[in-house]
Amino acid sequence: MAAAGEADSNRWNAMRRLSRKVTQYSFRIVLALIVAGLAGCAASRGFDQAAMREALHLDSLSTPENQSVSHESARPSPPFRLGVFFVKHDVPDTPSIRKVEWLSADRDQLFRKLAPLRDEQLLADTFVLVDVTLRSDNVKGIRQAGARFGADMVLIIDGIAAVDRYNNRLAWLYPTLLGAYLLPGTESDALVMATGSLWAVRSDWHAPIQTVEIQSKVKGSAAFVEDATALQEAKQQAIHSLGKRIAEVLQSPK
């Protein structure tokens, strides 16, 4: 009996030692994964604004003919029926740039910004132009679509975004595991570039291209910082600024 009890005790002790080794080994794996993750976003990379401008074709939009009001044709007389076309980019997200997804909430925000122009008898109606076959560079096609739906002008809204996610000095405490959940050692910076261009549908009149660049930051622990939060905040501010500029263009007598 004594021999059997001693054997059971030895087996129990061996199992405890094995359990401790497995726990230590698992902890080392988790720690290595955390350190590797921290190394991947340790420093700020900034934004590749050249790639963003290229995606928006801003260099071609910045030509003198696009940056000055066209006087070849008279501007339509108010109140205008304004068709708004939100550009969709069918390109994959990359480390340099990300697509801007235009949601119904974004459209509603822009329309609220333009709503006072109806009280000023400048806008008769504002509606969304939907045509999945049209691209941002097909201005003629967008104007023709606007004419089919009875618009006097079309407003083409385009945008691109980028995220710079990195760790600050507090991230050195992340390997404690608990630190990755409690310490604000991770920052997510978002940049949204947005453009708005106004075109008459029955003449060659167009207004200067309006461009805004808005940055937003979210800071917190690595486990809870969401890039999408920073992107949404930057997008909302961009729509606000762009809507204000478009309203000023429509309020201009020229």
Please annotate each region the language model reported.
Residues 2-7:
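Extreme N-terminal basic, low-complexity initiation segments
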Residues 9-10, 14-41:
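Sec-dependent bacterial lipoprotein signal peptides
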Residues 38-59:
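Bacterial Sec signal peptide processing site at the extreme N-terminus
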Residues 52-81:
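Short N-terminal or domain-adjacent regulatory/targeting segments
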Residues 78-165:
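N-terminal segment of the mature soluble domain
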Residues 136-202:
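Surface-exposed short loop/turn segments
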Residues 183-193, 199-245:
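Short secondary-structure boundary motifs at beta->alpha junctions and helix caps
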Residues 245-254:
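C-terminal, charge/polar-rich interaction regions
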